[in-house]
Amino acid sequence: VENRTLRYLLYSFIALTAFGAGVWMNRTRQTETLPVAASDALLALALPDLQNKVQSLSQWRGKVLVVNFWATWCAPCREEIPIFVKMQEKYRDQGLQFVGISIDQADKTSEFSSNFKINYPSLIGTFDTMEISRRAGNDKRVLPYTVILDRKGQIAATELGGLTEPKLEFLLKSLL
């Protein structure tokens, strides 16, 4: 009976470890897993900003572009935005550009942007905009979801869930 219990615990540990590794590895996808069409669709996206002026993501081609799908009611989004503000300030002169795509109402996004002193463009998307994030690897259509494009406009990395400062620094390091 003791051997049987030990074996059960060992198999359970192996299964949980394999599952955890699979989840962790799937969190950050590299370009090879995403079609070029996904980056083209993302760059073709044109949405209104907080002044209701339509902005196309293609205007930032040639920069390292960090596109973050978020909402004001999303707790992990609220945690990572101060990091984005800090990174935008730190790396702006090296060609880094953040763009937030809020899946929320414009008035709520505007108030949030003021309160959090967001120093990069905030565009207003809809739940239909989440289809673009799905094409860029967000299969579950959850928030936050971040797509990092290199200077050539190709998807370099994606992140499902909130980003930490060390993780973001790591992802940006080779692109800047």
Language-model features, listed with the residues they occupy:
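Short pre-active-site segment immediately N-terminal to redox-active cysteine/selenocysteine motifs
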Residues: 63-65, 69-73, 105, 142
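N-terminal targeting signals for export/organelle localization
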Residues: 1-44
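Thiol/disulfide oxidoreductase modules built on the thioredoxin-like
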Residues: 112-118, 125-173
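Conserved hydrophobic/aromatic "anchor" residues
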Residues: 45, 69-70, 112, 120
